[in-house]
Amino acid sequence: MTETTPEVEVAVEAEVTYSESFVFERPIQTVGRRKEAVVRVRLVPGSGKFDLNGRSLEAYFPNKVHQQLIKAPLVTVDRLESYDIFALLHGGGPSGQAGALRLGIARALIVANPEDRPALKKACFLTRDPRATERKKYGLKKARKAPQYSKR
C-alpha cells in the first residue's frame, strides 16, 4: 500500500541584490542616542538634503566639526548625495545631538544597504557611546570633587 512518488529536485536561486535603485516602500526610520540626546532619523532616496527639526544642516549645526561628524557615515560608504535625511532631535547639547544623529544615520544606511555594514562597523559608526554624565553625590560639591579639607 505504499506508493512511491518520484522526487524532483528543483534548484531555486533567490539572490537578493541591493543597489542604488533599491525602492523603498516607506522611509527607513531609526533612532540614535548619545548622552541625553535622542534623534529620530528618516532616510529617503534623494539628493543629499538634510532637514533637522525643519532647518538645514548648516543652520542647525553651524560648527564645521559637527557637520563633518554627521556626514562621516555617508562619506564612508559614498552615498552623500543618494539620500535625503529628515531628523527630529531633542535633548542634550550640540555635541550629543551630532553624535546621536551620526549613529542614527549609520543604522539607517545598514537597513537601506546591508553590504555597507562592514565598512561602517570598521569605522566604529555603529557603536553607541555609553559615556554619560556621572551623578552628583551628597557630601561632595560635584560628582567627585570634595569640599576643601581644613586640618585645623
UniProtKB/Swiss-Prot annotation:
- What Pfam families does its record include? Ribosomal_S9
Protein name (database record): Small ribosomal subunit protein uS9
Q: According to the lineage, what is the superkingdom? A: Bacteria
Provide the GO biological process annotations: translation
Q: Which organism is it from?
A: Mycobacterium ulcerans (strain Agy99)
Q: Which family does it belong to?
A: Belongs to the universal ribosomal protein uS9 family.
**Entry keyword set:** Ribonucleoprotein, Ribosomal protein
User: Which GO molecular-function terms appear in the entry?
Assistant: RNA binding; structural constituent of ribosome
Q: Which HAMAP family match?
A: Ribosomal_uS9_B
One GO CC term, this protein: cytoplasm
